Amino acid sequence: MFTSSSPEQRKPRQSRQLPGAACEECRRKKLRCDRQQPQCGGSSLERRLEQQMQTALLPGDDILNMLDEPAFTVFPSSEDQLGLPAFNITNSTRGEQCQDEQFLDHFADMKGSEFTGTLTTTSIPELMRADLTLRADYRRGNGRDQLYFDRVHIFTPIIHQRRYLSWSKDAHKNEARVCLQYAMWALAASFSAPFQHLRDALYRDARRMLDLLELSDGAMATHHLEQAQAWILVAIYEFMRMNYQVGWMSAGRSFRLVQLMRLYGIDGANSPTQELPQTSSMEWIETEEKRRTFWMAYSLDRFISMRDGWPLTLNEQVVTTCLPAPEAAFQSGKPASGGFLSETITQEDTGALFSFTECIIIATVCGRSLSHGQKLEVERVYGDVSPDFWQRHQWLDAIVKKRIEILSLRCASATEVVDPLLLFTYMMAQTTVLYLCKLVKSVTWETDKSNPIVQEYEQRSLAAAQEIVNLTHTLKQFNFLKVHPFMPLPLYLCAEFLSMYRSLDASFDAQLQEVQNALRNLQAVNNLARTYLNLLQVKEREGSLRSSSEEIDL
């Protein structure tokens, strides 16, 4: 049985082999040529795309100027925008057919091709639409690549710019690198006002390609670093623009890839880097990218587990990978060592560390604090609190104090706007004080409410909460598109603490309002802020209902 079709669909399909010789441009690009004179449809199509991109997109200087506008200039995407309608390419039915065939042939003929044996013919045109637009855009000068390194790299410094640019234009790059490119472009677009209308389409293509890559033949035989990097970037995008659960699952995929590639043991005694010394700058850069990818996944694992106290995936106890080298050394390709985490975290005088390294140290403290609290819960199940609790607690407390002193000096001494990664790290350090205070109160509540340790922690928690509130004013210096993507996390944890312990200080109500206002300001560009605001409202209602119930019982 055949379904009815339009007159155009009932026409017999033309032979794929057309008479005449293909034009030089199509032969060079390995595309199917329609042999039209004086110019084939493929070449004219690309020229029209470039012209429309030049009209639709602003020059580089204008884009950079627009990026500094306030966040409220961001326009939300709509369903009709997700199909990229800004690039309205009109053509005859014959021209569209030629266009589709050219790119179908292009994907089918590529050696080491993008998605060889994995893409179906129905999914190729969807990817082709975005690919057409982006190819024309990037031919204008790496605008979105540069946007990634200007806006996103400061939060996720895992990609070497020169190395990336060396393979980014290669038509025969492997599938993992194509996935990474689309993930980079999607995240970069989400941090840019002019490119907001592109972000969802880029994300959908990146996510679809990553899913297909995992299902391809030989997917389990080899894993590329770029695949893990792409999942990290996609997870960050999903936390910001989708929802927490979707981002959580994607983050888990990146953690498993990091484990499969053994990135936690890059500098161990029996690792390849120790057995085969690196002789070239590029070899060191590739290894440093692996280190940074591991530490990014490691930090992400700890930060996203803080909200609900979830168990960690990446075990600190088996890590033998050095900390990241300084950024200048990384980008210049000059080998340098970042040292091991256990040594750096206990050193008395470390000087001014790389911002990413400071973030990793605080992520480690967050992870150890989580494990500290989880051990406490287990100890309660089996009996009394172990004496080891206080030893662990004092050790963590000493590290937090030290890092807060260092970070406060660095933030206070900044002559210009504070580094957003450093600001986020400092706020997470203050949040850890609040978390440790909650643990102390939960333990001493069962013994002595007037314990001096409790009183000391109450005072320190008051100071930490006040400092976080003060830092929310610093956020006003930033375009909201330049704020760290996980900034809503310390704001939420602080607001939760202020709401839970309002009785500690009369100023907590006013401070709570300031923190909630900061979350409201961020929710336009970050769904995490909206999620946390909703959670606070739910907890507020539950607290009100509980208070009403207690009054009735009395």
From Swiss-Prot:
Its main location: nucleus. GO terms for biological process: DNA-templated transcription. Residues 1-21 are annotated as: Disordered. Pfam families: Fungal_trans (PF04082), Zn_clus (PF00172). Keywords: DNA-binding, Metal-binding, Nucleus, Pigment, Transcription, Transcription regulation, Zinc. It is found in: Nucleus. Signal peptide: none annotated. As colorants, MonAzPs are widely used in various food products for centuries. Moreover, MonAzPs also possess wide-ranging biological activities such as antibacterial activity, preventing hypertension, lowering cholesterol levels, causing hypolipidemic effects, and displaying antiobesity and antitumor activities. It comes from the Eukaryota. GO terms for molecular function: DNA binding; DNA-binding transcription factor activity, RNA polymerase II-specific; pigment binding; zinc ion binding. Disruption phenotype: Impairs the production of azaphilone pigments (MonAzPs). Almost completely abolishes the expression of the azaphilone pigments (MonAzPs) gene cluster gens pigA, pigH, pigM, pigN, pigO and pigP. Decreases the expression of pigD, pigE, pigF and pigG. Does not affect the expression of pigC, pigJ, pigK and pigL. GO terms for cellular component: nucleus. Gene3D superfamilies: Zn(2)-C6 fungal-type DNA-binding domain. Residues 23-40 bind DNA. Transcription factor; part of the gene cluster that mediates the biosynthesis of azaphilone pigments (MonAzPs), a complex mixture of compounds with a common azaphilone skeleton very widely used as food colorants. Positively regulates the expression of the azaphilone pigments (MonAzPs) gene cluster. This is Pigment biosynthesis transcriptional activator pigB.
